[in-house]
């Protein structure tokens, strides 16, 4: 499945009785326009890349998310100054980077924290980073990162859960990735910007977030070409300068709202988007019967066709269908006509949302990494628990279509990757609220239950 062996991942922590939860009154259409936030995965990599320079950087379109706050805390623990200066703008001053080791209690909860390894090594000549945490969705090995840094001349050892890398000066090298890992590609690319000589990464990841990182590094003076292709060439430079940069829109949030439109048979306008970042998602959505049109610069309109039909999906590295959209599309296929087969080839443990969707009335069976989805006429509201970030989004989408009340616990997963998702959905007419157990909810508050007139039509 393209997976390399790694240290075992821990099971997701169960939701606590004191945790907040979402309550959704489903079965109603949505209407309106939604604004897409900046890409979480790009933002995290760019924050790490800012460590490569000794001058201040300003990042625009950074989403307000738990993962962003955690990365900010990690950078601050290293002596870096991070300051929000506007709603979605961060100033990062890396001049005072002086600490080469990150605290375990911060790194353990954020897998993207591993991105700081390459920049710290390139700047300080040594880095000590605990093995990272994040969603428990299967093996996500760091050995590709390690081999890449070793090819640049670093001495790397993993001991007692700590990755320690040393290099008096990194040197360019030629690296072939056994798997086009986004994280490994980005780690090597960042470190190589300050290495002596030329570095070539073959079988590199082609995701838009890799291109965004390369563009940011270029804006700081790095010499990178080929990002977005299978071969990336980096010519090292002695130093990088500060930069002001806008993060790309989040293609996964875009796809999530497209799925919400499809499952509720609603017409939504979604932007800003780069359609080329979503080619596989758009193709599958059209196969299933949705009508998708570009109605303005960077704005897509999704509207219902005659029926929602079954289709088969196989997750693949970009430009294939993204694993981060698998769970959301499974929710849509659960109420489509016919039988679909979803093959998860990127992460071997990313079907944990299936039992929760079945609690809502879906008919899904898992066999050897494949999910067989038999479409049903309707879903019914029920209490469910999110097991990871994208599973939480899938449950929200299913809850929007399910008749009756759905409650979703485990919102710490959702808050890692979606900025103000319930407020965005409320603005589209969804009957959704966040509650604390200490204040038991009524069925649905009158303000939310009323909703805008345009959203009152049942699905």
UniProtKB/Swiss-Prot annotation:
The entry's localization annotation reads: Cytoplasm
**Which GO BP terms, alphabetically?**
cell division; cell wall organization; peptidoglycan biosynthetic process; regulation of cell shape; UDP-N-acetylgalactosamine biosynthetic process
In this chain, UDP-N-acetyl-alpha-D-glucosamine is annotated as bound at 111, 140-144, 324, 346
Instruction: Pull one GO CC term from this UniProt entry.
Output: cytoplasm
Pathway noted in the entry: Cell wall biogenesis; peptidoglycan biosynthesis
Reported function: Cell wall formation. Adds enolpyruvyl to UDP-N-acetylglucosamine.
Name used for this protein in its record: UDP-N-acetylglucosamine 1-carboxyvinyltransferase
Species assigned in the record? Gloeobacter violaceus (strain ATCC 29082 / PCC 7421)
């Amino acid at each position: 499945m393209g997976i390399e062996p790694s240290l075992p991942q821990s099971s997701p922590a169960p939701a606590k009785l004191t945790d907040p939860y979402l309550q959704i009154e489903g079965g109603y259409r949505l209407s309106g326009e939604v604004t897409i936030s900046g890409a979480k995965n790009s933002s995290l990599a760019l924050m790490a890349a800012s460590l490569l320079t000794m001058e201040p950087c300003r990042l625009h379109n950074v989403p307000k998310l738990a993962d962003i706050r955690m990365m900010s805390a990690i950078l601050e623990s290293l002596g870096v100054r991070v300051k929000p200066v506007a709603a979605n703008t961060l100033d990062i001053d890396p001049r005072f980077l002086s600490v080469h080791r990150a605290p375990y209690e911060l790194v353990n909860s954020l897998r993207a924290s591993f991105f700081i390894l390459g920049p710290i090594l390139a700047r300080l000549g040594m880095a000590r980073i605990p093995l990272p945490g994040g969603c428990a969705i299967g093996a996500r090995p760091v050995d590709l990162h390690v081999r890449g840094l070793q090819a640049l001349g670093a001495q790397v050892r993993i001991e007692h859960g700590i990755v320690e890398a040393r290099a008096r000066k990194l040197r360019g090298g030629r690296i072939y990735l056994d798997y086009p890992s986004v994280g490994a590609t980005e780690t090597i690319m960042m470190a190589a910007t300050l290495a002596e000589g030329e570095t070539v990464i073959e079988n590199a990841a082609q995701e838009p977030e890799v291109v965004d990182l390369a563009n940011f590094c270029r804006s700081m003076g790095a010499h990178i070409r080929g990002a977005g292709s299978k071969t990336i060439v980096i010519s090292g430079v002695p130093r990088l300068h500060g930069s002001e940069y806008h993060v790309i829109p989040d293609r996964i949030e875009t796809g999530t709202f497209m799925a919400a439109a499809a499952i509720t048979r609603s017409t939504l306008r979604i932007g800003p988007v780069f359609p080329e970042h979503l080619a596989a998602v758009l193709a599958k959505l059209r196969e299933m019967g949705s009508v998708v049109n570009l109605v303005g610069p960077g704005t897509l309109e999704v509207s219902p066709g005659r029926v929602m039909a079954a289709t088969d999906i196989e997750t693949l590295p970009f430009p294939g269908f993204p694993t981060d959209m698998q769970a959301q599309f499974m929710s849509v296929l659960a109420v489509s006509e016919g039988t679909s087969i979803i093959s998860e080839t990127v992460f071997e443990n990313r079907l944990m949302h299936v039992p929760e969707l079945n609690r809502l009335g879906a008919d899904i069976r898992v066999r050897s990494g494949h999910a067989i989805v038999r479409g049903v006429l309707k879903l019914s509201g029920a209490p469910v628990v999110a097991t990871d970030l994208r599973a939480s989004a899938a449950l929200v989408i299913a809850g929007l279509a399910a008749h009756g009340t759905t409650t979703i616990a485990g919102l710490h997963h959702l808050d890692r990757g979606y900025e103000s998702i319930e407020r965005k959905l409320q603005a589209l007419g969804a009957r959704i609220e966040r509650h604390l157990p200490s204040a038991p909810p009524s069925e649905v508050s009158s303000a939310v239950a009323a909703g805008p007139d345009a959203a009152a039509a049942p699905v």
